[in-house]
């Protein structure tokens, strides 16, 4: 039987895109799926490898022996950012492409980012099940009930390396306070009794600048003390979403359980203009200047 390998890199959101692409390909090719984790040996950013915290069978992870043998007989498909050279045989696409379907026979390894829902949209329900955290404590379950039962808005504010790392800031840029103010206004003009649940990798900053973003009459709750997987799961239970330009943010909204909800995303997604052909947001999402 042929094998589909998804090489993982980056934080949780990126890992989920890479897994979703590999999963969809493995189902469509009737192949077994393996995860290549070689990049995590010395990788500690963003919590390192995180998919083992989700409802994913760990037998999918390649052994050291498999990683040594596999590259000798595969064709690699690469979906990459410009000027990022990864290997000699490439499948390059700056935008969504299905060119590889049917054109690659046998075993294949997918290396890259694959940040477009069309690669795996038809598997959404299964992915929602797979991407559920395996450890959700009672407090988080009770909070999820509150989120589901209110006119809830998940607000994700990404700071972290977007603030501390100059190169990351040049690539991604940072969502401004004005973006959040405009997004909140957009929802308040359409819905009543909104409750804002704020998620962030810098929750203290959010608390400090609450009055710069929210009005005094807004019902705002700051969510903290959870793992990132549980935070994402809680976000997915909200009716409406205001996301940052972050793959973590993207998944919190895309996995939502309320199909009638609105998702607001920043534009442009990247600070570097040439990267915006990689914009991952579905067309139906509302876009507001970041």
Swiss-Prot record:
Query: What modulates its activity?
Result: Addition of metal ions dramatically decreases the activity to 0-40%.
For this protein, what is the EC number? Answer: 2.4.1.341
Q: What does the UniProt cofactor note say? A: Does not require a metal cofactor.
Keywords associated with the record = Glycosyltransferase, Lipopolysaccharide biosynthesis, Transferase
Q: Which Gene3D superfamilies match?
A: 3.40.50.11350
For this record, an example GO cellular component is: membrane
InterPro entries with a match to the protein in the record: Glyco_trans_11
A GO molecular function assigned to this protein is: galactoside 2-alpha-L-fucosyltransferase activity
Reaction catalysis annotation: GDP-beta-L-colitose + beta-D-galactosyl-(1->3)-N-acetyl-D-glucosamine = alpha-L-colitosyl-(1->2)-beta-D-galactosyl-(1->3)-N-acetyl-D-glucosamine + GDP + H(+)
Q: How does activity depend on pH?
A: Optimum pH is 7.5-9.0. Exhibits 60% activity at a higher basic condition (pH 10.2).
Database matches in Pfam families:
Glyco_transf_11
| GO biological process terms, semicolon-separated | fucosylation; O antigen biosynthetic process; protein glycosylation
* Pathway where this protein functions: Bacterial outer membrane biogenesis; LPS O-antigen biosynthesis
Claim: Transferase is one of the keywords in the record: yes
What does the record give as the function of this protein? Answer: Involved in the biosynthesis of the lipopolysaccharide (LPS) O-antigen region. Catalyzes the transfer of colitose from GDP-colitose to the galactose residue of beta-Gal-(1->3)-GlcNAc (lacto-N-biose) via an alpha1,2-linkage. Is specific for beta-Gal-(1->3)-GlcNAc, but can use GDP-L-fucose as the sugar donor with almost the same efficiency as GDP-L-colitose.
What family does the Swiss-Prot or TrEMBL record give for this protein?
Belongs to the glycosyltransferase 11 family.
Q: What is this protein called?
A: Alpha-1,2-colitosyltransferase
Please name the taxonomic classification of the source.
Bacteria, Pseudomonadati, Pseudomonadota, Gammaproteobacteria, Enterobacterales
Q: Which gene encodes it?
A: wbgN
């Amino acid at each position: 039987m042929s094998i589909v390998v998804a090489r993982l890199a980056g934080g949780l959101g990126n890992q989920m895109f890479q897994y979703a692409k590999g999963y969809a390909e493995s189902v469509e090719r009737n192949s077994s799926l393996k995860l290549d984790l070689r990049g995590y040996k010395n990788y500690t950013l963003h919590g390192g490898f995180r998919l083992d915290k989700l409802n994913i069978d760990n037998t999918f992870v390649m052994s050291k022996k498999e990683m040594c043998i596999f590259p000798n007989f595969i064709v690699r498909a690469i979906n990459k950012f410009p000027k990022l050279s990864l290997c000699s045989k490439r499948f390059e696409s700056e935008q969504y492409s299905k060119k590889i379907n049917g054109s690659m026979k046998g075993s294949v390894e997918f290396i890259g980012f694959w940040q477009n829902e069309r690669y795996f949209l038809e598997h959404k329900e299964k992915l929602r099940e797979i991407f559920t955290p395996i450890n959700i404590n009672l407090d988080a379950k009770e909070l999820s009930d509150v989120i589901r039962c209110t006119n809830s808005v998940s607000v994700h504010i990404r700071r972290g390396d977007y603030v501390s790392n100059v190169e990351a800031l040049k690539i991604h840029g940072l969502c401004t306070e004005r973006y959040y103010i405009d997004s909140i206004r957009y929802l308040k003009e359409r819905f009543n009794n909104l409750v804002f649940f704020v998620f962030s990798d810098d929750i203290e900053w959010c608390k400090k600048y609450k009055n710069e973003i929210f009005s005094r009459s807004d019902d705002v709750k700051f969510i903290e003390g959870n793992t990132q997987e549980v935070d994402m799961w809680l976000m997915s239970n909200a009716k409406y979403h205001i996301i940052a330009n972050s793959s973590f943010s993207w998944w919190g909204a895309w996995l939502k359980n309320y199909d009638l909800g609105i998702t607001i995303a920043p534009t442009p997604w990247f600070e570097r203009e040439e990267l915006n052909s990689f914009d991952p947001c579905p067309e139906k999402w509302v876009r507001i200047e970041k």
